[in-house]
Amino acid sequence: MTQTWNLLQAGQERNYKVAYINARIIDPETKLDIEGSLLTEGSKIIDFGESLFSNGVPSGVDETINCEGLVLMPGLVDIHVHFREPGQEHKETIYTGSKSAAAGGVTTVVCQPNTTPAIDSVILAKYLKYRALETSHVNIEFYAKITTSEEKLTEVALLKEAGAVGFTDDGIPVMNPMIMRQALLYSSMLNVPIAQHAEDLNLSAGGAINEGKISEALGVKGILSASESVMVSRDILLMKDIENVHYHILHISSKDSLDAVKRAKDLGLNVTCEVTPHHFTLTEDIVKQHGAIAKMNPPLRTEEDRLAMVEGLKTGVIDCIATDHAPHDRSSKDLPLESAAFGIVGLETMLPLSLELYHSGQIDLFDILAKLTYKPADIIHVPRGRVQKNFVADLTLVDLNYEWEIKIDSFASKSKNSPFGGRKVKGRVVRTIVSGKTVYSQK
C-alpha cells in the first residue's frame, strides 16, 4: 500500500477541472444515491449526475479519476480533536494531526482549546489560524475557551470575531453555574454553541475508569456515571429559559445523560450532543486487557450504556459522531492506571468503526454518514459535509466493503495510543479531497 499526502494551503488551482467517473455518489442530506460522475472546478462542485459524461469526458477536463466500485461522498467533519499545538508538539501537531485526519477521510476538524497555553485570547486564536494555513492538510476550525483559568469569561465576542466556531473548556467542565449561565447567554447573542465537558468533579475527582465491577476488581478509584448526567441536567436547567441558545454536550457516554437530552429535546430545547466511536463500540471490560491505553475521559462504561449510545444514534437523540482524538506519547501511557493520561487517537478509525453499525444492519447508511458529515457541520454553522452543486468540493472516496486490519503502527498521527489495534473492519478511505484538491490518496 502506497500513501500520499499534500498540504492544503491555497487549495486547488482556480480553473483546474477534475472528473470523477463511474462513482456511486452519496449525499446524506438529500438522500442522493446514484451511479454516475461528478465534476469539480477549482474548489467547487460544478455538476454531477447519472448521465454526466455519458458521451465521454470532454477535452477541457484536466484530470480524470475512475471511481469504479467506490463511494464518492461528503468529506467527514470531526468537531472534536486535540492537535496539541501549541505546547505539546511531542504528542501531535497541526501538521501530523491533519495528516491523520486526511488519512481517515476527514476534511474538516475542530481543534479544542486546552493547549499550552490555552486558546483564550485573540492573539492565540490568530496564531492557531496562521499555523493551520501554513501546515494543515485539511480545514481547521477551532473552539476557544469559555473561561480564563476557570475563573472568569473570556472575551467571547472578540474570539468569535477572530474565528472561533464555539466555546468550551474541554478537558475540564465549567463547574461554576453562574459562569456557565453567562456563557449560555452569550450563545444566544452570538449564535454559537457552548460545548460542555459534562463532569461534576465533586463526583469524579481522582477517578481513573468507570466506577463499577472493573474498577472494583482492579482496585482503582472509579468515575461515577452520575458525574456526567448530573452536569448535563444542571446545564439544561440553566439554559431552558434562554431564547436562541445552543448547548452542546461533548463525548456523551452514559444512558442517564442521554435520557436527560431526550427529555430536553422533547421540550423543544436546542440541545445537541456527540458520541465517540469508542463509546458505542467498547465497554469498561477491555480495560482489563489494554490497561491505560483504554483510559479516557469520560471512561468506557457498561454494556447498557454502550447499547444506549447505539440506540441514541438510531433515534437521532445523538446528533453526530466525533472522535475526541487525544494523542499521547508512550511515556504518558506507560504508567499505572491512576497516573496515566486520559485519551486515545481516533481520526483514522472513525469511519470503519462507524460503518460497523451499517454493515451489521443496525443503522441505515444515510443515517451513519449524516452524523459524520453535514450534521456536525451544522452544529458549528460551517457550510461543509454535502455533495451538492456549487458547494465546496470536500469529498471522500471510500471502498465501502474493503476488509482490513487496524495497524496502529501505520497511523499518520504522531501518537499511537489506540485500543483498536488488530481489530478487523470494513470500509477504507481511498482518497480525500479538500476544496477540490487531493490531500490524501492510497493505492
From Swiss-Prot:
<dbReference type="InterPro" id="IPR032466">
    <property type="entry name" value="Metal_Hydrolase"/>
</dbReference>
<feature type="binding site">
    <location>
        <position position="324"/>
    </location>
    <ligand>
        <name>Zn(2+) 1</name>
    </ligand>
</feature>
<feature type="binding site">
    <location>
        <position position="114"/>
    </location>
    <ligand>
        <name>substrate</name>
    </ligand>
</feature>
<dbReference type="GO" id="GO:0006145">
    <property type="term" value="P:purine nucleobase catabolic process"/>
</dbReference>
<feature type="binding site">
    <location>
        <begin position="342"/>
        <end position="343"/>
    </location>
    <ligand>
        <name>substrate</name>
    </ligand>
</feature>
<feature type="binding site">
    <location>
        <position position="82"/>
    </location>
    <ligand>
        <name>Zn(2+) 1</name>
    </ligand>
</feature>
<dbReference type="GO" id="GO:0004038">
    <property type="term" value="F:allantoinase activity"/>
</dbReference>
<comment type="function">
    <text>Catalyzes the reversible cyclization of carbamoyl aspartate to dihydroorotate.</text>
</comment>
<feature type="binding site">
    <location>
        <begin position="82"/>
        <end position="84"/>
    </location>
    <ligand>
        <name>substrate</name>
    </ligand>
</feature>
<protein>
    <recommendedName>
        <fullName>Dihydroorotase</fullName>
        <ecNumber>3.5.2.3</ecNumber>
    </recommendedName>
</protein>
<dbReference type="GO" id="GO:0008270">
    <property type="term" value="F:zinc ion binding"/>
</dbReference>
<feature type="binding site">
    <location>
        <position position="297"/>
    </location>
    <ligand>
        <name>substrate</name>
    </ligand>
</feature>
<dbReference type="InterPro" id="IPR050138">
    <property type="entry name" value="DHOase/Allantoinase_Hydrolase"/>
</dbReference>
<feature type="binding site">
    <location>
        <position position="251"/>
    </location>
    <ligand>
        <name>Zn(2+) 2</name>
    </ligand>
</feature>
<keyword id="KW-0378">Hydrolase</keyword>
<dbReference type="Pfam" id="PF01979">
    <property type="entry name" value="Amidohydro_1"/>
</dbReference>
<feature type="binding site">
    <location>
        <position position="197"/>
    </location>
    <ligand>
        <name>Zn(2+) 2</name>
    </ligand>
</feature>
<feature type="binding site">
    <location>
        <position position="170"/>
    </location>
    <ligand>
        <name>Zn(2+) 1</name>
    </ligand>
</feature>
<feature type="active site">
    <location>
        <position position="324"/>
    </location>
</feature>
<comment type="pathway">
    <text>Pyrimidine metabolism; UMP biosynthesis via de novo pathway; (S)-dihydroorotate from bicarbonate: step 3/3.</text>
</comment>
<dbReference type="GO" id="GO:0044205">
    <property type="term" value="P:'de novo' UMP biosynthetic process"/>
</dbReference>
<feature type="binding site">
    <location>
        <position position="80"/>
    </location>
    <ligand>
        <name>Zn(2+) 1</name>
    </ligand>
</feature>
<dbReference type="InterPro" id="IPR004722">
    <property type="entry name" value="DHOase"/>
</dbReference>
<keyword id="KW-0862">Zinc</keyword>
<dbReference type="InterPro" id="IPR011059">
    <property type="entry name" value="Metal-dep_hydrolase_composite"/>
</dbReference>
<dbReference type="InterPro" id="IPR006680">
    <property type="entry name" value="Amidohydro-rel"/>
</dbReference>
<dbReference type="GO" id="GO:0005737">
    <property type="term" value="C:cytoplasm"/>
</dbReference>
<comment type="similarity">
    <text>Belongs to the metallo-dependent hydrolases superfamily. DHOase family. Class I DHOase subfamily.</text>
</comment>
<feature type="binding site">
    <location>
        <position position="170"/>
    </location>
    <ligand>
        <name>Zn(2+) 2</name>
    </ligand>
</feature>
<dbReference type="GO" id="GO:0004151">
    <property type="term" value="F:dihydroorotase activity"/>
</dbReference>
<dbReference type="InterPro" id="IPR002195">
    <property type="entry name" value="Dihydroorotase_CS"/>
</dbReference>
<feature type="binding site">
    <location>
        <position position="328"/>
    </location>
    <ligand>
        <name>substrate</name>
    </ligand>
</feature>
<keyword id="KW-0479">Metal-binding</keyword>
<keyword id="KW-0665">Pyrimidine biosynthesis</keyword>
